[in-house]
A protein has these predicted regions:
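N-terminal Sec signal peptide and the immediately downstream disordered periplasmic leader
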Residues: 1-67, 73-79, 240-241, 320, ...
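Acidic, small-polar-rich N-terminal luminal/periplasmic segments of exported/outer-membrane proteins
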Residues: 33-168, 546
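Outer-membrane beta-barrel translocator/receptor signature
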Residues: 110-112, 124, 133-136, 142, ...
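Periplasmic-side early beta-strands and strand-to-turn transitions of outer-membrane beta-barrels
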Residues: 159, 166-168, 176, 188-284, ...
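Membrane-embedded beta-barrel scaffold of Gram-negative outer-membrane proteins
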Residues: 321-328, 332-348, 502, 508-518, ...
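Outer membrane beta-barrel strand-and-loop segments of large Gram-negative receptors
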Residues: 360-377, 420-422, 428, 434, ...
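Gram-negative outer-membrane beta-barrel transporters
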Residues: 378, 384-386, 455, 565-567, ...
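C-terminal beta-signal and adjacent terminal beta-strands/loops
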Residues: 567, 657, 668-676, 697-749
Length: 749
């Protein structure tokens, strides 16, 4: 609350300062400037954001750069209802929109929020944490997108649009240096190769820091970053009808594996024992709480631990995309072709203590090919339509191993390795392959019933064929617990109905119904019970939304608001359960869930040089009917679904005798969240507010800019996730960076 008051105070001061300075300006200089028109492709065609009957937040490349959004994780909180977390340093972000997402970190589980780059669905969670650079825009679509986007978008979608080649020569570069010896350099350049017919753009990223977590055993730093990326793009436009965009991209991350904070939870005294049998709050660092091997972490510093080894999280990505369009006159044919390859090798010290309780190794390779054809109407007649075909092939090879309680091995003549699976002692492995084949046919149309009233209808039929080969073994195949083979076909019909009414040229009302669909499948996590591998069902949602989009004061004030209600059936849920000493993963369907709430976004330009934005979300998200493995979760809140969240920014630019001053202050706030389905209090996090700022100096009409920046200025505790590993006696905290700050230099030509 204090931080929100500070932000409000700064906003008031900024407005007073602008009012004072404007009196010294001429009438022309003081005239407010209208808000920029925002063009989005949420409905697979370029449209004014205010005319699109979908809840969309759009952020330009410049806005992302000013807020230091380096990947999809950094988008968390920047759009109403958007929360993102991870338990890894280089892969597997978990995205939630309006409380809808999947808590599972395994690469075989698709998110409920689809990520798209230049129209291509990024199927692999291994690739969804790739660095952002050289971007034109990012769009966050809230609500099911089952018609035009299809499977795995019951929560929504994130559209990432990269900068395209141009026949006009140009380039830009940005370099930053900050706390933890952080270096970030990114940029791009391009121009014509053969007149206006053929042009290119090459862009890249280098991002490295020493890390913000300390190993007490060695003094070394962890949770570091070391990644680079390169993208080469060509645009061929031989005439006004044909446009072909081709791109190749490489990404590589070789930073350290995640270092979590270990909270000991097994009480060793009656005084420290809580009602649930675990340690009471307030005793975790007292020395009266240990893990399964008796280690007691007595430090409350969430950015340090006793790490036996310092592993690496290596991710290598390759992508090739071809976007081709051909104007046929009354319609345009589009083709989107893509191939993606993602490989990962992650070795992490999961328990964060000097004793060998548990360590993990994750090795994965995922290859995806996809093809989409769309035929869309041109022109501005009363009927506008799009129809298409989609096909995708996805192959995953995954090999996970947990080395559990190796210090308790007792080799004998009869058992030379000392493994004891019955007591969870050994190296437990789960090598698997998962193959998916998907296709869909879809169509959507808009028809103007009158000059002001427009009807929208759409349908999509989807088929997903999946097969799995899964092995559960001990000590790298020395003992095989079971082998499972399964296959199943999932079919679904999703769609959309809507009405949009134009009150005026600057105000629209809309009401929509969407049927969303998330394909069923096979669990690809770690289990010792073959029954857990029975296929889980499709997730479906009936979503109702009403909204208003309006602009006032000669387009100096923009207000968009929406209210929504979701009725979920068979919501896919990831959780953990206890089997012996081992905490194992479990994936199932909740019978029903209910989500409803409201959102609003305000953007204003009250005076020349001053921009204000504010977003708010009020959310109710709970399981209505969910009984699993003997536990009743009905009535519990969904994970990562805060009841209240805000985001906002103030930006001011003002001419100086030499150059221009730029200043920005932005914030995100969310209320309390739970990280598990059981709503366990110790696995929750209180309300958090993060405030960031930037002050800069622009020269030569904005061609050059230098300045200072800070993120998390008040050093708010930055907990991304808390995972209970109760069988081994600890909770693992995944931590985001503390306060960071630095300097930057940008140039363009």
């Amino acid at each position: 609350v204090r931080k929100l008051q500070v932000f409000a105070g700064v906003a008031t001061v900024a407005l007073m300062a602008v009012a004072t300075s404007s009196r010294a300006q001429t009438a022309s200089e003081a005239a407010p400037v209208a808000l920029d028109e925002i063009v989005v492709t949420a409905q697979k065609r370029a449209e004014n954001l205010q005319d699109v009957p979908v809840s969309v937040t759009a952020m330009t490349g410049a806005q992302l750069q000013n807020q230091r959004v380096g990947d999809v994780l950094a988008l968390s909180g920047l759009a109403p209802g958007l929360q993102i977390k991870t338990d890894d340093n280089a892969a597997n972000p978990r995205m939630f929109i309006r409380g809808i997402g999947v808590n599972d970190f395994n690469p075989g589980t698709a998110s409920a929020v689809g990520v798209y780059v230049d129209g291509v669905y990024i199927a692999s969670p291994l690739a969804q944490l790739a660095g952002f650079y050289d971007l034109e825009q990012v769009e966050v679509l809230r609500g099911p997108q089952g018609t035009l986007y299809g499977r795995n978008t019951t929560g929504g979608a994130i559209n990432v649009v990269t900068k395209k080649p141009s026949s006009t020569p140009g380039g830009d570069i940005a370099v930053e240096y900050g706390r933890f010896n952080a270096v970030n350099a990114q940029g791009g350049f391009g121009g014509p190769i053969a007149g206006d017919d053929l042009s290119f753009r090459i862009s890249g990223l280098y991002d490295k820091n020493d890390g913000y977590t300390t190993n007490r055993l060695t003094g070394n730093k962890g949770n570091d970053a070391n990644r680079w990326a390169l993208r080469a793009a060509l645009r061929w436009k031989p005439d006004d009808k044909l446009t072909a965009d081709l791109s190749l991209s490489l990404n590589q991350s070789r930073g350290g594996s995640i270092w979590t904070y270990n909270r000991s939870i097994l009480p060793q005294t009656a005084e420290a024992t809580g009602a649930d049998g675990f340690c009471k709050a307030g005793f975790y660092t007292s020395g009266q709480c240990t893990n399964a091997l008796g280690y007691a972490n007595t430090s409350g510093n969430l950015y340090e631990g006793d790490y036996r080894f310092e592993g690496k999280d290596i991710v290598k990505l390759f992508g090739a995309t071809a976007n081709v369009s051909y104007d046929l006159g009354d319609m345009t044919l589009y083709s989107v072709t893509s191939y993606q390859r993602a490989a990962r090798d992650d070795w992490e010290d999961t328990d964060a203590n000097p004793l060998q309780v548990i360590s993990a190794r994750y090795i994965a390779l995922q290859e995806t090919a996809s093809q989409e054809f769309r035929l869309q109407s041109n022109g501005e007649g009363p009927l506008r339509w799009v129809t298409g075909l989609y096909w995708a092939k996805d192959d995953l090879s995954n090999d996970s191993h947990y080395d559990v309680l190796s210090d308790l091995r007792n080799p004998t003549v009869d058992n030379p390795t000392g493994m004891d699976p019955a007591n969870s002692i050994g190296v437990f492995g789960w090598p698997l392959t998962l193959k998916s084949r998907s296709w869909a046919v879809f169509g959507q149309f808009d028809y103007d019933l009158t000059e002001r009233l427009t009807f929208t209808g759409g349908l999509r039929y989807s088929v997903d064929d999946k097969s799995i080969h899964y092995v559960s073994d001990v000590d790298y195949g020395l003992v095989t617990l079971f082998v499972h083979d399964g296959d199943k076909s999932f079919k679904s019909l999703s769609g959309r109905l809507g009405l949009r009414y134009a009150l005026s040229d600057d105000a629209n009302l809309y009401a929509t119904y969407n049927r969303g669909y998330k394909s069923g499948g096979f669990f690809t996590g770690q289990t010792a019970d073959e029954a857990d591998l029975e296929p889980y069902s499709d997730e479906t949602v009936d979503a109702f939304e009403v909204g208003a989009k309006s602009e006032f004061l000669d387009r100096r004030l923009r207000l968009n608001a929406a209210a929504f209600y979701y009725d979920y059936k068979d919501l896919q849920v990831y959780t953990t359960i206890q089997r012996g000493l081992l905490t194992v993963q479990y994936f199932t369907n909740a019978s029903a869930a209910r989500v409803y709430g409201a959102e609003a976004e305000v953007e204003a330009r009250p005076a020349r040089g001053l921009s204000l934005t504010l977003g708010a979300s009020l959310l109710h998200a709970e399981y209505e009917d969910f009984v699993s493995v003997g536990e009743d979760y009905s009535g519990n809140r969904l994970p990562s679904a805060p009841k209240l969240s805000f985001n906002g920014a103030i930006r001011y630019e003002h001419p100086l005798p030499v150059g221009d001053f730029t200043g920005q202050l932005d914030f995100t706030h969310r209320s309390k969240v739970y990280f598990d389905t059981a709503n366990t209090e110790r696995l929750s996090d209180e309300a958090r507010t993060f405030v960031n700022g930037q002050v800069g100096w622009k020269l030569d009409g904005g061609r050059y800019e230098l300045g200072v920046w800070g993120k998390n200025l008040f050093d708010e505790t930055n907990i991304l996730d808390i995972t209970a590993i109760e069988g081994l006696g600890f909770d693992a905290f995944s931590m985001g960076p503390p306060r960071t700050y630095g300097v930057y230099l940008r140039a363009r030509y």
